[in-house]
Amino acid sequence: MVGKGNECAAARRRFSLRAAAASSSSSSFLPCLLLAAALSAGCCRAHAATARAPRSLLARFPTTKMTSELEKEAGRYVDDSSQAARTNNKITNLQVSFVGHGHDTPADGEGQFADAAYPAKWKPDQDPSTPSLVVAHHLPNGNAPFIDAAYPVKWSPRADGPPKQPATFPASPNGEKAEFTDSAYSVKWSPRSVAPPKAPGIFAQHSNGNKAQFTDAAYPVDWNPRSVAPPTPPAALSSLAHPAAGIHIQRGMLFLMKKLHPGAVLPEGTKLALPHGDHGVAAAAPRFIYKDKGDAVPFDLRAMDAILAMFGILPGSDKAAQVADTLRACSELTAAGGGGEEPRACCATSREAVLDFAASALGTSAPRAVTTLVHGREPRRYVVAADGVARIGGDAVVACHPMPYLYEVYYCHRPADAVALRVDLHAVADVGLGGATAVAVCHVNTTTWDSAYFELLKASRGDAICHYMPQGYVLWLAN
């Protein structure tokens, strides 16, 4: 796709007009706002479902507006292009923009994200002073595959129920997928997708399927024997036909809302920080390219050869396969939204698109972004702190998850029936180690979810199910 900017700009203008009309109207909420994050042939529009949380459960959690620490964590990813975008979009009061990825280093110096997004810092010599089409110096290890995400996510327009057949992907002897580190929210992939890479990476691997599920992570995923992780819609985390088919969830990532309370101990090995390499340094990840240059870069599976050549990626490599999977998933998402059926998800290839989607989906000109903050080294086990759980935001959230690509591409969606929580976590018995201020999302209407989830969590159908959003994932709030 070339020339995405014109469609995005038109969508943003339409949103600005609607937002202005809404502000002068007595109506408190527009049932369906136009989304300004446009993909090749169409624009995404937000789903306007309101979360219906169990009052008895949510009453236990105080509502707080104290998200400044998490906002600070998310707000270090602002540059001139996003400032200009906010001006053009009349988003003048935006408090934070977006998170970035980088090297885990608390050292002082220029290029640092001050207390940063997982404490992160960009090396000055790696941050281009001028916009450039070529961001190969931000790409990890040439043709090596991208690092796996925290839990793969997929949007499927046909994902109204559990898959018709159980997955048969083999598990490794220790009960985890050999090909993946845990990932968070998988994206839908084509049947022509390849086997998952064996090297670690920061983004989730994805696969095809008419199945809507999560994998190896905060959301489990059903596996296709011929490819990698399949899909999951925001409306339902349906996955496998039965646990024997192989649900694998990142330790401690998925839990019941009713079991979230001060003193609750998370499973040993729960990881909320970015993956680290052999030298204890957070893996580098691609960054957004500048919007004016991004419009000139094709984002279309039909231009695959040109894209690989532009970024110096070897055809047939694992990374090339991941690039193809992301392009295919986003093109299918665009096609699904072309019929005016209110798709609730969008692939965003620029900060402007992310901001536009969040603003229009939440019905506000000033959305706030929050992300999980890890304090120092992660302990072996976390425990929920006293008075450590509070509700943040209202009845609508927008979650954005990174996808494996040559520059930053985010899968953003507004899940139905979801509420956001801030959870303060401390180390258990690990003196000197830090804790975390985590963001969690709870899905309060699980009546249509696959029974495998309830068996896994020893829960009853309809119980509210939550998951943490690890570093690298961003949650947008309306207030």
Curated annotation (Swiss-Prot):
It comes from the Eukaryota. Residues 1-46 form the signal peptide. The keyword Repeat does not apply. Residues 254-479 form the BURP domain. Glycans are attached at N445. The keyword Transmembrane helix does not apply. Transmembrane segments: none annotated. Expressed in stamen. Keywords: Glycoprotein, Signal. Residues 158-177 are annotated as: Disordered. This is BURP domain-containing protein 4. It comes from Oryza sativa subsp. japonica (Rice). The gene is BURP4.
